[in-house]
From Swiss-Prot:
Location, primary (coarse class): cytoplasm
E.C. number: 2.1.1.199
Protein name: Ribosomal RNA small subunit methyltransferase H
GO MF, one example: rRNA (cytosine-N4-)-methyltransferase activity
Catalysed conversion reaction: cytidine(1402) in 16S rRNA + S-adenosyl-L-methionine = N(4)-methylcytidine(1402) in 16S rRNA + S-adenosyl-L-homocysteine + H(+)
Entry keyword set: Cytoplasm, Methyltransferase, rRNA processing, S-adenosyl-L-methionine, Transferase
Entry function: Specifically methylates the N4 position of cytidine in position 1402 (C1402) of 16S rRNA.
Source superkingdom: Bacteria
One Pfam family this sequence matches: Methyltransf_5
Family: Belongs to the methyltransferase superfamily. RsmH family.
Lineage: Bacteria, Pseudomonadati, Pseudomonadota, Betaproteobacteria, Burkholderiales
Length: 316
């Protein structure tokens, strides 16, 4: 099934990176290198390629083999496709060699809409949830072996679900009866039988599915590693743009950027402001989708993009 995917904050992300001092002043003698951390269906990658000169290069990462198959159809010698997590990007580029990095942390519409991927509680399919279907346990396999405490922890921590214990207890009870959830709709029905209250506009299974997806794919661990790798790879003057879709991701991005945008000076030390060392990052902007974009693409409504620039002359 060919399901269209609309990249979120497309124009804003391109402007954020291309508007940085390095790419803005690109010429044929500059060796411009840009990284797109998640190819998805190529919207951001292809839009950025249009803004780069013929001698530029781009590396796009994705853990999803379906995304890699789409990416390999792009006939552009400037583009290198890597089947790996952006958390490993520092294995594919030299330190301080990259002019711009984009991390779009959302899952793509095909991943949600294709039932066999197991991401959607609205579509009957195997309870898989893996981005990389060649690696790791499926959500169903993990739920069959995890303890009550482990399931509770995952749903509470990554889904911020207040009924985490009750949901975990129901899963374990079904498992003990020889009926562990194997499909998306089985799990969604089980959660709905426990979570009696509904948040406005949200299915009772939303938080549980989010939690399992984040855990199975190590999304927050990858984000933390990816941010550290980005700091290592960015040239002074290069920009980092990160699009997040829920509070757990955005909190990590916000705290990371803020931590690198300040200078720790011992309290009481008599140092004039002009003599303070520079911070590693300068925070550029925080953007949300316009009302028009959300109207056209409701999945964009929770997106937040944070942009920062590595200071010239500052250490990582």
């Amino acid at each position: 099934m060919n399901i269209a995917h609309r990249p979120v904050l497309l124009a804003e992300a391109v402007t954020a990176l291309v508007g940085g001092p390095l790419i803005q002043n690109q010429n044929s003698e500059n060796h411009i290198l840009v990284i797109d951390g998640t190819f998805g269906r190529g919207g951001h990658t292809q839009a950025l390629l249009k803004e780069l000169n013929p001698s530029a290069h781009m590396i796009s990462f994705d853990k999803d083999l379906d995304a890699i198959a789409v990416a390999q159809k792009i006939n552009d010698p400037r583009l290198k496709i890597v089947h790996d997590s952006f958390a490993q990007m520092d294995q594919y580029a030299e330190a301080e060699s990259v002019d711009g990095i984009l991390l779009d942390l959302g899952i793509s519409s095909p991943q949600v809409d294709e039932a066999h991927r197991g991401f959607s509680f609205r579509r009957e399919g195997p309870l898989d949830m893996r981005m990389n279907t060649d690696h790791g346990l499926t959500a169903a396999e993990w739920l069959e072996q995890a303890s009550l405490e482990e399931i509770t922890h995952v749903i509470k921590t990554y889904g911020e679900e207040r009924f985490a214990f009750q949901i975990a207890r129901a899963i374990v009870a079904k498992r003990e009866d020889g009926l562990p959830p194997k499909t998306t709709t089985q799990l969604a029905s089980l959660v709905s039988s426990v979570v009696r209250t509904r948040e406005a506009g949200q299915d009772p299974a939303t938080r549980t599915f989010q939690a399992l997806r984040i855990f199975i794919n190590r999304e927050l661990e990858d984000l933390e590693l990816g941010l550290k790798a980005a700091m290592k790879l960015l040239k002074p003057g290069a920009r980092l743009a990160v699009i997040s879709f829920h509070s757990l991701e955005d909190r990590i991005v916000k705290q990371f950027m803020q931590a690198h945008a300040k200078v720790d000076v011992p309290r009481g030390l008599p140092v004039r402001e002009k003599d303070l060392p520079q911070s590693a990052l300068k925070i550029i902007s925080r953007l949300k989708p316009s009302d028009a974009e959300v109207s056209e693409n409701p999945r964009a409504r929770s997106a937040i993009m944070r942009v920062a620039e590595k200071r010239i002359g500052a250490a990582s």
